[in-house]
Design a protein with these regions (language model features):
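Short active-site neighborhood of thiol/selenol oxidoreductases, capturing the structured segment around
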Residues: 97-125, 141
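Buried hydrophobic packing residues in well-ordered domains
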Residues: 92, 107, 111-114, 125, ...
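Soluble periplasmic/extracytoplasmic beta-strand elements of cell-envelope proteins
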Residues: 108, 140-144, 206-208
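Short, small/polar residue-rich loop motifs at catalytic or cofactor-binding pockets
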Residues: 80-82, 103-104, 202-204
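Structural microenvironment flanking redox-active thiols in thiol-disulfide oxidoreductases
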Residues: 122-182
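Hydrophobic beta-strand positions
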Residues: 86-87, 209
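N-terminal targeting signals for export/organelle localization
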Residues: 3-82, 242
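Thiol-/selenol-based redox modules, centered on thioredoxin-like
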Residues: 195-242
Length: 242
């Protein structure tokens, strides 16, 4: 039969071959679809292995340098979040977690009369503010560690001098012990146990990246340009995650 087919005229040979192929595909159509779906799945898996999705770590007290963590929470390995707070910003407005609901934010500690690292940190916060000025998903939050000195009027003066965008960036003051507790037990951002006494100064150069679930996703040196670049990159990674 094969010999007979091979000796057919070309038009008839093409016709016969076409009929054979149509018969094959009609008979194995389901198998072809299955193979196509499986191929797509395999290709997707291989792509994800070769190009893994970037995911930022979730920092827990037990996994952070013990110098930065209050002894009462050093055992915590999961579910750590930033505690609720109620502070006053540069416009005299009460600021709580509700103002940061469904927001990614960068937090730090500072005081307006600082002449060492604070000006550098504030300048770098301004850089972040400028880079993300049209991004309503990201906000900034700076906590004064000398709230007795940093009154609302003082914070407002400082905000105007630095070009703070009130809609994006809150400079907050308030109860000193509350701020120190936040710094030590929530932000994991200080190296000494402070209790809010008059001369008890807690202050580090850390910028803390907080996600929409109030979890810490990164620590950055607020005085270093390369850390600010990394922070901006990590914010974009976090946005994709959310």
């Amino acid at each position: 039969m094969f010999y007979d087919i091979c000796h057919l005229p070309l038009p008839q040979l093409i016709f016969c071959f076409s009929k054979i192929m149509l018969h094959f595909f009609s008979r194995y159509k389901f198998l072809g679809i299955v193979l196509l779906v499986l191929s797509s799945i395999i290709i997707t898996i291989i792509y994800q292995i070769i190009n893994p999705k970037e995911v930022l770590p979730v920092f827990q007290p037990a996994g952070v340098n013990t110098e930065l963590v209050d002894s009462t929470i050093q055992h915590i390995k999961k579910y750590h979040t930033i505690a609720d707070f109620s502070l006053i910003n540069q416009n005299g407005k009460t600021i709580t977690q509700e103002n940061y609901k469904d927001k990614i934010y960068v937090a730090d500690l500072f005081f307006t009369t600082c002449q060492t690292i604070c000006p550098i940190m504030t300048d770098n916060m301004v850089v972040i503010q400028e880079k993300l000025k049209n991004d309503s998903e990201v906000m900034l939050l700076s906590h004064s560690v000398t709230p007795v000195i940093d009154s609302v009027a003082q914070l407002k003066k400082y905000a105007l001098e630095k070009g703070v965008n009130d809609a994006k960036w809150n400079l907050v003051t308030g109860d000193k012990k509350q701020i120190y507790t936040l710094a030590r037990k929530s932000y994991l951002a200080v190296k000494e146990d402070g209790n809010g006494d008059e001369y008890d100064m807690i202050h580090t150069e850390n910028f803390i990246l907080v996600d929409k679930k109030k979890r810490i996703r990164g620590f950055y040196d607020g005085t270093k340009e390369e850390d600010i670049v990394q922070l901006l990159k990590d914010i974009q990674i976090l946005k994709k995650e959310n």
